[in-house]
């Protein structure tokens, strides 16, 4: 009996759902988070033109990865569902094509063995094709059962893998921040960003889950004594603490992709001495467990930059999202350039031989240094204030040499020097404040930071190629006839949409203008 179009559509949707769920189930059984559809997400990120990715980040901010996941899921379900209306043979062909794409994406993942990649891809493909003959109701039942089992298996494995890590005492503990380092102003960014509110961004899809007992840190390349350290062996080495800002290169001026934390780990230079790095080596390539790589020019050491391999954040072991068990940290360098997560190996080499992920995507080969930067946290953009004395406050940073002063300007007038809280260190951000006698009307507030080696750039620029530039600027209303508001929603939404669109346009223009190197 022939199917009606709606019945055929449901049959195709059910078979596609079985295929997706079977891929997740097989991945859970094999002990990996990389299922076929997630591998496709990573392949998509690696394949799309970098300017297009930059536009997506500018427009979607934290929603870029969820948008990719939703789009891939809808595509994986929708194409077979539509193909089913053309007949069973067309449906089988669509599922086979989807399965082969997933297999190809899995095959590219360096953290998966060939056996695992083939198993996941073939299981998902076979399950989808078999789902054609189950019927819609049975397919959905099997799919939900497989997805539920995958969730249970992953949670059980996660609990078993949750091994306690006892952090060593650093050589010179920093101690608690002094009270003078924190300004008690509502709405001001915290001096130390809590781990659960620290921004998370990377090109991994999904974040790797590392088994601590099996993890090794390998130091190789141009060294006399190659090293292979367990986590316990790394923890036994002399460590230090540092308060430092970490910022994504895609962070717009005044944006959320920046945080300040207390990190603990070992100095890269100590590991290089231990391994006997060759004197002619001038570059270090860092490899992640998922195949991502980034480099550190050893010339940075002469300029006051101090790369570290860190395993603790705010006094606790790194979380999976933040790179557990070990990540690199180079205060003063943007995140993508050297601060890689889930570190697996350190390769000592010559710069002339180094082409890493970012360079292959068109980013410059030179180190991406953070510029002096300042952000206004209080008041919010679009706030409605009363006509009396207001406090303007925010945070400023200029790692690794520190902030010299912060200035505030109202309506394009003269700059006034802001009061700084006590700095935790040259690589950390510092809180600042300034009084303002607000008068009725709409006003524009701007801030800039003077670092030890220069001042924040005024000319607005896109994140590519050296990080976003320009003064952080907000506008507020001052009225005596209305109740003060933290944010005027409609105005704020319109301004936010305009800012995202402008950032995306600047990004496209920057890529056209610079004609980036491609490795």
Language-model features: locations:
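Hydrophobic helices that insert into or interface with lipid environments
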Residues: 91-182
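Extracytosolic (periplasmic/ER-lumenal) interhelical loops and adjacent juxtamembrane/interface segments
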Residues: 37-59
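Alpha-helical transmembrane segments in multi-pass membrane proteins
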Residues: 15, 19, 23, 45, ...
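Membrane-helix interfacial "entry" motifs
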Residues: 4, 8, 35, 60-68, ...
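Hydrophobic alpha-helical transmembrane segments
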Residues: 61-84, 96-99
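Alpha-helical transmembrane segments of integral membrane proteins
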Residues: 3, 7-15, 67-71, 93, ...
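Structured, non-membrane catalytic/scaffold regions adjacent to prosthetic-group chemistry
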Residues: 165-515
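N-terminal signal-anchor transmembrane alpha helix
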Residues: 7-32
């Amino acid at each position: 009996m022939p199917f009606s179009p709606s019945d055929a559509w449901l049959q195709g949707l059910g078979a596609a759902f079985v295929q997706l769920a079977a891929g997740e189930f097989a991945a859970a059984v094999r002990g990996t988070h990389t299922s076929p559809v997630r591998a496709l997400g990573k392949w998509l990120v690696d394949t799309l033109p970098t300017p297009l990715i930059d536009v997506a980040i500018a427009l979607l901010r934290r929603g870029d990865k969820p948008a990719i996941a939703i789009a891939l899921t809808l595509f994986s379900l929708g194409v077979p569902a539509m193909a089913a209306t053309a007949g069973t043979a067309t449906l089988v062909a669509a599922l086979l094509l989807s399965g082969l794409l997933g297999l190809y994406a899995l095959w590219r993942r360096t953290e998966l063995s060939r056996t695992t990649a083939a198993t996941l891809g073939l299981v998902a493909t076979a399950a989808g094709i078999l789902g054609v003959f189950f019927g819609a109701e049975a397919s959905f039942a099997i799919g939900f059962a497989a997805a539920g089992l995958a969730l249970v298996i992953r949670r059980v494995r996660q609990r078993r893998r949750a091994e306690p890590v006892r952090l060593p005492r650093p050589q010179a503990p920093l101690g608690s921040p002094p009270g003078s380092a924190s300004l008690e102003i509502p709405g001001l960014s915290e001096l130390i960003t809590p781990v659960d509110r620290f921004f998370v961004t990377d090109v991994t899809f999904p974040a790797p889950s590392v088994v601590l007992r099996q993890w090794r840190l390998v130091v190789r390349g141009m060294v006399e004594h190659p090293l292979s350290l367990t986590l316990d062996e790394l923890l036994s080495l002399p460590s230090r603490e540092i308060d430092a800002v970490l910022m994504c290169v895609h962070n717009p001026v005044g944006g959320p992709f920046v945080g300040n934390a207390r990190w603990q780990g070992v100095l890269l230079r100590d590991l290089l001495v231990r391994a006997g790095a060759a004197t002619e080596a001038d570059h270090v390539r860092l490899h992640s467990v998922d195949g991502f790589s980034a480099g550190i020019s050893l010339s940075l050491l002469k300029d006051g930059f101090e790369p570290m391999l860190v395993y603790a954040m705010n006094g606790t072991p790194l979380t999976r999202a933040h790179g557990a068990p070990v990540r690199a940290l180079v205060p003063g360098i943007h995140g993508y350039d050297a601060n890689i997560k889930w570190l697996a190996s350190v390769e000592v080499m010559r710069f002339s031989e180094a082409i890493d992920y970012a360079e292959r995507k068109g980013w410059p080969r030179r180190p991406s240094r953070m510029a002096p930067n300042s952000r206004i946290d209080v008041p919010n953009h679009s706030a409605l204030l009363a006509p009396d004395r207001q406090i303007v406050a925010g945070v400023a940073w200029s790692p690794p040499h520190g902030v010299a002063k912060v200035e505030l300007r109202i309506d394009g007038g003269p700059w006034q020097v802001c009061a700084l809280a006590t700095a935790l260190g040259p690589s950390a951000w510092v809180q600042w404040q300034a009084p303002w006698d607000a008068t009725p009307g709409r006003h524009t507030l701007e801030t800039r930071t003077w670092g030890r080696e220069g001042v924040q750039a005024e000319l607005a620029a896109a994140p590519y190629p050296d990080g976003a530039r320009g003064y952080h600027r907000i506008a507020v209303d001052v009225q005596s006839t209305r109740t003060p508001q933290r944010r005027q929603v409609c105005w704020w939404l319109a301004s936010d949409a305009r800012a995202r669109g402008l950032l995306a346009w600047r990004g496209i223009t920057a890529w056209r203008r610079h004609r980036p190197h491609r490795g």
